[in-house]
Amino acid sequence: MTLKSAQPPLINKEFIMRYLALVGWLLVSLNVMAEEPKIAAKSNEKDLPVPELQSFVTKHKGTFNNKSISYTATVSNMHLLNDKGEVIGDAVTTAYVAESKNDRPVTFVFNGGPGSASIWLHMGILGPKLVSVPSDAQDAGNGPYELINNPYSPLDKTDLVFIDPIGTGFSQLAGKGSAKDVWGLSEDAESVSQIVKLWVSQNKRWNSAKYLAGESFGTTRAAAMMPYLDDRKSPMRINGLMLISQALDYTGSTPAEDNLVAFVTYLPTLAATAWYHHKIEQTSISLEKLMTEVKAFAVDEYLPALFKGSTLNEQQFNHIANKLAYFTGLSVELIKRANLRVTATRHAKLLLADQGLAVGRLDSRYSSDEIDDLALTPRYDAASVAISAAYTAGLNHYLHHDLKVSWQRDYVVSSSEVNKGWVWDRGLEKGKEPKYVNTAPDLALEMRKNPAMKVLLASGYYDYSTPFFDGEYTFARHGIELSRVTQTYYAAGHMMYIHQPSLKKLAADIHQFIESK
């Protein structure tokens, strides 16, 4: 139906002028709004600031492994360049170089994450100072915290260079740099290799023996760096790798429901944790004997049972369930309800559930009081929250007071921005299926190219992040030259050095590793 409009009223001249003015104002406003994204886009194209090169140099003296050592500490930055010679990053290192007439080895140190600064190895075992935290898996409390001399530092045997990859510590993107340049498995390996080579060139240390020491993802990085260090352009050989809490092949350290391998590699860690928390009677079996038994069961009985799956008969199913209940400290009923599959995260939540507690991920000796006792996984990592504030405060105090660093920006201990933005594949071709991260073949290849390179593999029994049995599994199946690998174990977790007896043992093992031929 069509409605007839009424006769329009007469419009006077004043109304027309006001109307035109309003239209003009709207057009101007719309034009400004349309141009704003162009302005924003143009601002995004601007280069990031490029910090000036600075060095903070201090002189010190300390006693390490009963030897008096005079050394220079240098906190300095360097500019990382892309293939065009443009600055993409500003990398900061902390170096300790002893006064010596001899050509000493130099060890390059980094932690993992990805997105973690080198604070843990720096202030936990290798540097000249230690952050003092309780050895018995108790919370470190609130400040002030104690910084103590580290008599176990290997400074008597090797110079040390602590590397904070871009986005961690004081290191940052700069100039033309963006996340895609450095925050990926291959990109990170290349950029950290560039840091190593730059430091060696700037300090005239090309002919020194060289070691890499990495922890957790830092071990992934160390292996991934091999093709970038020992390349055709400027080949550099590494004398040895110190892999602390290794994570080379992620198949065995990814506790997913459909990953049968991880149920096997994690089981000894679950058993060690059950033993530590008295869910397995300690007087009836030692930790070492328990580990021997559980590893044999995991490989000889548990893995075949997982592969058989629903074809297991009732007798076989019940046998495996009873053995798992013993090794994990959980009830037979719960094991059966889980279809013989209890992930590490579920075990961390369930083991001490009768006490309203969950065990820690980085170190399962720790436990936390859970708000929600019915949740499937722990709310947070008891080990991490127990020590992180102490390490952060201790390092910042040390940098600004002892090493005289005057930068006012934050020292980024752990970057969620780096971690969440990480690109894990290594240039995966289109049409190819994704797979677990694995840098073990890089290590195996380099050990063949460099027949004198040696490896130290250090693992903690109570580590739910990188289970120690996965280290054995990884090194046994990738063609790695085991005759040049030293495997050591500690009654602690991921950062085993926060446990005083393990600190002493790992320090001695590192000392012996550097001295060995």
Give short role names for the model-derived ranges.
Residues 36-43, 85-181, 476:
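N-terminal cap/lid subdomain of alpha/beta-hydrolase-fold enzymes
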Residues 52-95:
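N-terminal cap/lid segment of alpha/beta-hydrolase-fold proteins
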Residues 155, 182-200:
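Alpha/beta-hydrolase active-site loop
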Residues 205-216:
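Alpha/beta-hydrolase fold nucleophile elbow
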Residues 214-227:
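Glycine-rich nucleophile elbow surrounding the catalytic serine of serine-hydrolase chemistry
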Residues 230-312, 318-323:
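A catalytic-pocket lid/entrance helix-loop region that shapes and gates access to the active site
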Residues 244-245, 249-262, 330-515:
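C-terminal subdomain of alpha/beta-hydrolase-fold enzymes, centered on the catalytic histidine
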